[in-house]
Amino acid sequence: MDIGRAFSFVFQDPAWIRKILLLAVMFFIPIIGWLIIGGYTLRLIKNVIDGVPQPLPEWDNWGGDLGGGLKVLVVGIVWGIPIWIITAVLDAGDNWFLGFVSWLLSVGWSAVQMSAMGDLARAGNIADAFSMKVVNRVLNNFPIWIVYILGTFVFGIFSLIGLIGLIIGIVITASIAIAATAHLGGQAYRLSEGAAVPAQPRF
């Protein structure tokens, strides 16, 4: 797992400015744009899993990204239901410890959801994202997914830097953070499946 690489790969793509700006523009298009973001990041995850040297996708499959985003939405909702129920029960009581446990479960569950996205990205079939292997992959490779979770915290903090530039700044840094999180998730999935992450290309 390489958190630094998950961040730096964006800037090693010759067309990264255009690709990130288009990703940022999608934030301003309600629903359709947000779904396209989901489909685009799904392609990014697949590229990392497949070992593509420059995994940041080209913006050349708008319809496919929209359809992929719908699949991401369905997978996210279905896998979100168990943790929503558990956290609702834990948060119902006025107990700080149960609240802390609820938070930990929510954080940990993000790894399970990324594991499901990896199956969806690799197979393209939404049914592949709904099996116990999604959970087992995380449990059997827990150290790898801990690094993924830590990385998402780092990228989340980075995205807040954009607040300095107000709305435009935050969507740019958020777009980079989304790409970095997808890359790290692809790394975690690939390593969990027993494949080494390819060496970083030199430019």
Placement of each model-derived feature along the sequence:
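Generic alpha-helical scaffold signal
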Residues: L35-G39, L56, D60, G64
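Selective recognition of hydrophobic, aromatic-rich stretches within alpha-helical transmembrane segments
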Residues: F27-D50, D91-A129, T152, G156-A196
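Short helix-loop boundary/capping segments at the starts of domains
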Residues: W34, D50-Q54, V72-V75, W79
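Membrane-helix interface/capping segments
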Residues: K46-D60, I86
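Interfacial aromatic "cap" segments that immediately flank transmembrane helices
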Residues: D2-F27, W59-I85, A111-I161, G185-Q187, ...
